[in-house]
Amino acid sequence: MALSMLSSIPNLITHTRLPIIIKSSSCKASPRGIKVKIGNSNCEEIIVRRTANYHPTIWDYDYVQSLRSDYVGETYTRRLDKLKRDVKPMLGKVKKPLDQLELIDVLQRLGIYYHFKDEIKRILNGIYNQYNRHEEWQKDDLYATALEFRLLRQHGYDVPQDVFSRFKDDTGSFKACLCEDMKGMLCLYEASYLCVQGESTMEQARDFAHRHLGKGLEQNIDQNLAIEVKHALELPLHWRMPRLEARWFIDVYEKRQDMNPILLEFAKLDFNMVQATHQEDLRHMSSWWSSTRLGEKLNFARDRLMENFLWTVGVIFEPQYGYCRRMSTKVNTLITIIDDVYDVYGTMDELELFTDVVDRWDINAMDPLPEYMKLCFLALYNSTNEMAYDALKEHGLHIVSYLRKAWSDLCKSYLLEAKWYYSRYTPSLQEYISNSWISISGPVILVHAYFLVANPITKEALQSLERYHNIIRWSSMILRLSDDLGTSLDELKRGDVPKSIQCYMYETGASEEDARKHTSYLIGETWKKLNEDGAVESPFPETFIGIAMNLARMAQCMYQHGDGHGIEYGETEDRVLSLLVEPIPSLSSE
């Protein structure tokens, strides 16, 4: 089938100019080419390369190095500790289960839950142990039932969908009277995104809540509730980047009638102090990036240090994980450069050489590489070995084999896509996906992340890591499909392989609109798998599972309004400013 498809290609990509190699007997230089001397002959080979015309970074070195926060020092540390001591007793004083759940929900959405993980776990354990008693506090209360369901599932407790059966009528449909409870409907909608495969009740709940929440917005409902409903319908809470959600929710919470001023002050101060930590990480990485000179030497590629750092903040923002953010930023930045080598600049012969060198992981094998690839490989080799050296010091483990395998697999997947491009081959959707969940770089990111946060490192986890456990696969799949929704048209214009949308159109004859709907459907189905594998007993620590989930969330954040990684303006610029540059205005009581 693959061979038969080589002869045909959709009109969508036939206009793309292919990179070509011209052997010039007259030895004239092409203004679009690079002249390379061929042996001792008088002729030169002119390699005409593609260009993606990426815009230079808007975040220059001097600007990044100038970022400073006022929220550092002993005064703020003492104030934060005092607020933390004030908040902790709240978790012990609330006794009613619904009050406990509401407090936990607020702490999570404000982004300060990580200070109280043990207390939250103790409360949820108590609630779960009483779960099957069907106490009066939740009976016939859609809001309470949905909130309990969402929080327990989010924290890995096995809660059945049947808990919502009592809200159905004799026909099996959700009761019409529920539509009057907009707060409960919103909570039901958010809870439905914690579903796993085969849960028809949760699918039914999502459709029911979505439909009636949309109608509710047309009515005169509470303004603050309407803001939360619009926000949820745009993207559900379970799919949102936690740090960005915290920044949004702090503003929303400040306007609520039930706002607790101690919680609000704590959330604002913690956000600003953590932002100061992120700025320190960012300045450190800016110095590293400048020292590599890759942005200068490989000017065909995207210079996206800030965006790559933003990814790491989205994946793991807590202040104690600075080393993870810094090393992950190196990984992300190298991925971006190498991706552009394969997608934009390299010839087929060069790409095959580079893939072989990465697979062999031998600096003595890189002599045949062109100079730009030597720089690229050495940066990759040195950064990876630096991380492996740190792991050897800290854990006594030799992890190079795991890291190099991940990079080798990535480059091989890039090479396959390059072969598809040069042969003008459009794969089936399944064939595309079976390769592209690796080429999106999720496995590389997550394999490195495991070694950056896991302690201890277990044999079972290493085995699961090597064969790419499902939690890695599903997270990477969501990353791939979200990327395709946001970038496919731009990438086709600059001469990339067809993405999932075009593969589905070519295979089925569907319209672009229908293909996009199908891709969105696949994202939803993959989230169900990720929910399931994130909740079952796992060889991985909770922190790593959170990273895998957050990588999927970050993908939907970055590609929600287009190519948020490659295009720096608009939403991405606003997010960088709100998360990494601008502190939240202080309360007058600070």
Curated annotation (Swiss-Prot):
EC number in record: 4.2.3.111
Protein's UniProt keywords contain Transcription regulation: no
InterPro entries per record: Isoprenoid_synthase_dom_sf, Terpene_cyclase-like_1_C, Terpene_cyclase_plant_C1, Terpene_synth_N, Terpene_synth_N_sf, Terpene_synthase-like, Terpene_synthase_metal-bd, Terpenoid_cyclase/PrenylTrfase
Gene3D superfamilies in the cross-refs: Farnesyl Diphosphate Synthase, Terpene synthase, N-terminal domain
The protein's enzyme class: lyase
Residue positions binding Mg(2+) 2: D339, D343
Motif (DDXXD motif): 339-343
Reported cofactor(s): Mg(2+)
Residues noted as binding Mg(2+) 1 in the record, renumbered to the chain: D339, D343
Binding annotation for Mg(2+) 3: D483, T487, E491
Domain notes: The Asp-Asp-Xaa-Xaa-Asp/Glu (DDXXD/E) motif is important for the catalytic activity, presumably through binding to Mg(2+).
Free-text function comment from the UniProt entry: Mediates the conversion of geranyl diphosphate into alpha-terpineol, a monoterpenol. Monoterpenols contribute to the final grape and wine aroma and flavor. Also forms some 1,8-cineole and traces of other monoterpenoids.
Name of the featured protein: (-)-alpha-terpineol synthase
